[in-house]
């Protein structure tokens, strides 16, 4: 139902609108309704021996071609196989049947890459033994290149070096410290598809001898799905089911975003689906599950988790331009309800020694909060408090944040500290 807005002085009718400055979200199921394949464009005109030298020397000189990287990764990884112990399908695509032996690139459709292959510097000293660690190194640089925080970047690079040394004790990093030639590789769609295919394959074959290649690719799984991760984290930190957590959504914006994320048919809860790789496989250019597209849900969920003493939530990004006041109150009420009650019940017994609760106890005083986690009871109580946080609620929040130190700007932790520790 449309609402008519009129100017009082002359009854002029206007239709208020905002500019459409954001692209709509794209769902993975919609991609597969239009196409039944994920194309991967690779130049296969050069031998694996040549490509191995091109990549090795290119990394050392700081002038490696991403086309060489992709072609080498394909050549080095295409013979890796795994035997399925169950049927594997996703979005109507039959990847393989139980008993089939499949490879990494059975997850995509290989296409020839047109154009001239860039020149490279050969290196006859490189051997097939390099193929045991060089793909790991190239894929690991994807993970390193995704972060710009110097300390964390160094930690990841050190971890990658250690992974490679476990395969080759004489390994030395090929990219000098401080050089960031690989940061832009994530902009190449063929490279990211290889990353996604590798991770999806080894997620299925977790015990494969080459599963350590996931060191760098694991960040491809659920990329740009931070709000979905927030939902999962909130369920864990509260100990409540997905259904019960959902009943605690008290803001229209959060509800709208929850509906957006829970659109049926997207295989969110299917572990071996293409869905977790919707970004790197190119299934979506705007994830329906990102914190950018679900800022209110992300803020509410992470703030609630923080007030329940989650260490992970302190560094969650604080979104811009959301309705902080109502979202903060909703998060505080939810955290206070969970933090003020313990979901305890006897789980086992010896013989018939079972505790039976006494329901005949007297009622609560007018201002006493409910003892359980039922949102209906808590909303009724909150109405009696004139829909404003009580002093005890504010004290609860202050205790949750008062010990937080070293908080980064524009994080949930920083926001909560300034809001409650006054």
From Swiss-Prot:
Listed name of the protein: Nucleoprotein
GO annotations of cellular component type: helical viral capsid; host cell cytoplasm; ribonucleoprotein complex; viral nucleocapsid
Residue sites binding RNA per the record: 143, 152, 206, 214, 286, 317, 408
Keywords: Capsid protein, Helical capsid protein, Host cytoplasm, Ribonucleoprotein, RNA-binding, Viral nucleoprotein, Virion
Subunit-level organization: Homomultimerizes to form the nucleocapsid. Binds to viral genomic RNA; this interaction contributes to the virion assembly. N in the nucleocapsid interacts (via C-terminus) with the P protein (via C-terminus); this interaction allows to package the L polymerase in the virion and positions the polymerase on the template, since P acts as a bridge between N and L. N(0) interacts with the P protein; this interaction prevents the uncontrolled aggregation of N(0). Interacts with the matrix protein (inner layer); this interaction contributes to the virion assembly. Interacts with the L polymerase.
Main location: virion
UniProt record similarity statement: Belongs to the vesiculovirus nucleocapsid protein family.
Species whose genome carries this gene: Vesicular stomatitis Indiana virus (strain Glasgow) (VSIV)
Pfam families cross-referenced by the UniProt entry: Rhabdo_ncap
InterPro entries: Rhabdo_ncapsid, Rhabdovirus_ncapsid_C, Rhabdovirus_ncapsid_N, Rhabdovirus_nucleoprotein-like
Ribonucleoprotein is among the record's keywords: yes
């Amino acid at each position: 139902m449309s609402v008519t807005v009129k100017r009082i002085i002359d009854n002029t009718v206007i239709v208020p609108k905002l500019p459409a400055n954001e692209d709509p979200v794209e769902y993975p199921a919609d991609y597969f309704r239009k196409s039944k394949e994920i194309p991967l464009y690779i130049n296969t005109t050069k031998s694996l021996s040549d490509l191995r030298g091109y990549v090795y020397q290119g990394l050392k000189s700081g002038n490696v071609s991403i086309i060489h990287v992709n072609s080498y990764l394909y050549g080095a990884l295409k013979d890796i196989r795994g035997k399925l112990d169950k049927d594997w399908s996703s979005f109507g695509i039959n990847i393989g049947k139980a008993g089939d032996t499949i490879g990494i690139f059975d997850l995509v459709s290989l296409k020839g890459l047109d154009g001239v292959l860039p020149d490279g510097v050969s290196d006859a000293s490189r051997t097939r033994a390099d193929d045991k660690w060089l793909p790991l190194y190239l894929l690991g640089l994807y993970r390193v290149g995704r972060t710009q925080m110097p300390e964390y970047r160094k930690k990841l690079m050190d971890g990658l070096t250690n992974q490679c040394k476990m395969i080759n004790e004489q390994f030395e990093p090929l990219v000098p410290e401080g050089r960031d030639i690989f940061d832009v590789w994530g902009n190449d769609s063929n490279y990211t598809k290889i990353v996604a295919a590798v991770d999806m394959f080894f997620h299925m074959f977790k015990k494969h001898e080459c599963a350590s290649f996931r060191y760098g690719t694991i960040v491809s799984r659920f990329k740009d799905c931070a709000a979905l991760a927030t939902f999962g984290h909130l369920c864990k930190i509260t100990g409540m089911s997905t259904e019960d957590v959902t009943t605690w959504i008290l803001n229209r914006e959060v509800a709208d975003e929850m509906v957006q994320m829970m659109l049926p048919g997207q295989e969110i809860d299917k572990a071996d689906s293409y869905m977790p790789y919707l970004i790197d496989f190119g299934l979506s250019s705007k994830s329906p599950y990102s914190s950018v597209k679900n800022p209110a849900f992300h803020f509410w969920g992470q703030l609630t988790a923080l007030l329940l003493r989650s260490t992970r939530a302190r560094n969650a990004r604080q979104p811009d331009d959301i309705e902080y006041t109502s979202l903060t109150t909703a998060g505080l009420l939810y955290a206070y309800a969970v933090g003020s009650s313990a979901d305890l019940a006897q789980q086992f017994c010896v013989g018939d020694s079972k505790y039976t609760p006494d329901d005949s106890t007297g009622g609560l005083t007018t201002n006493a909060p409910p003892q359980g986690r039922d949102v209906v009871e808590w909303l009724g109580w909150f109405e009696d408090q004139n829909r404003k946080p009580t002093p005890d609620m504010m004290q609860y929040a202050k205790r949750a944040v008062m010990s937080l130190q070293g908080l980064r700007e524009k994080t949930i932790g920083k926001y909560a500290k300034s809001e409650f520790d006054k």
